[in-house]
Amino acid sequence: MDLADLKNKLNRPVTLWGMMGAGKTKTGRHMASLLNLSFLDSDIEIEKAAGMTIPEIFEKYGEAWFRCGEEKVIRRLLADENPCIIALGGGAVMSTATQALLSRKALNIWLR
């Protein structure tokens, strides 16, 4: 199977998840470039939506608030179901609601 075949078979977003430093962003950008797909990073999208950095969110509102916002952003990124590559934050899969959303809406790849 070549890259064109792979791209044609993708019918949903691909998410990359793993611990911090696993290479989600680097791998995601490379995959998106090879497949000519959009690349999104959920951490960057969270910061845009909140108007502050992730450390600032944690300091001001705490982890529970952050995880709730993270789930909303991931839900938005997966809403149109078009193929794209999405790098998730290291703790995104800690939420059972986010896990369920990802299992329904995306092809998920764990990088270790």
Enumerate the predicted regions with their spans:
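Extreme N-terminal, non-catalytic leader segments
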Residues: 1-12
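Hydrophobic anchor at the beta1->P-loop junction of P-loop NTPases
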Residues: 16
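P-loop (Walker A) phosphate-binding loop of NTP-binding proteins
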Residues: 19
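Short, conserved catalytic or interaction motifs in soluble domains
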Residues: 22
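Walker A/P-loop
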Residues: 25
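ATP-dependent small-molecule kinase phosphotransfer cores
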Residues: 38-103
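Conserved phosphate-donor/acceptor-positioning beta-strand/loop module used by diverse small-molecule
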Residues: 102-112
